[in-house]
Amino acid sequence: MKLWSDSWINGDRIPPRYAAGRPDGAGRATFSDNLNPHLAWSEVPEGAKSMVLICHDFDVPTAADDVNQPGREVPADLPRADFFHWVLVDLPPRPTVIAEGEFSRGFTPRGKPGPAALHGARQGLNDYTGWFAGHPELDGRYFGYDGPFPPWNDSLVHHYVFTLYALVLPRLPLQGEFTGDQVRQALAGRVLAEATFSGTYTLNQRLLDASV
């Protein structure tokens, strides 16, 4: 099975339009267009009844002490963890494309509605739900796609992986609200094929200047 995108070249830097955050011109960050990228797939195995799409960042700091603190950087040797940006299940194998902006156009404070989604699919909670918990203006239930917004002072470039799974059943056995970890557990023994597509992103001005 193959997965690709017209939004950027596999492994390249993700354009800011597909991110939740972008540089603000003053060394920090602000909200961005937050469009879901175009994604398309082919060579779905015979017998596939549904698709699951997961987007995660595996470079998220496990401690927030230095996150977004002026005059400091999040150290590169800090242990990192997964952060789910999109959890989409029960997607029909056809049509074999997700259009740019079809599932997300802009950042929604307190989160987009869910779990019901287009094409009869369901969207899980992404990890901004936990990140913004307790925030007076942003606390909420974040369903669907919300793109990259890494710390603007992280010394690591973050990596984002879109993984598409073809399943043997039409509906994943999860009820109500669900998370990326719960979907990963539910996939066990039900996957016919999988494919990945990735990109990188940083808001650290030092790293951006070095890449020019």
Where are these regions (language model features)?
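N-terminus-centered regions that define maturation/targeting leaders and the start
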Residues: 1-212
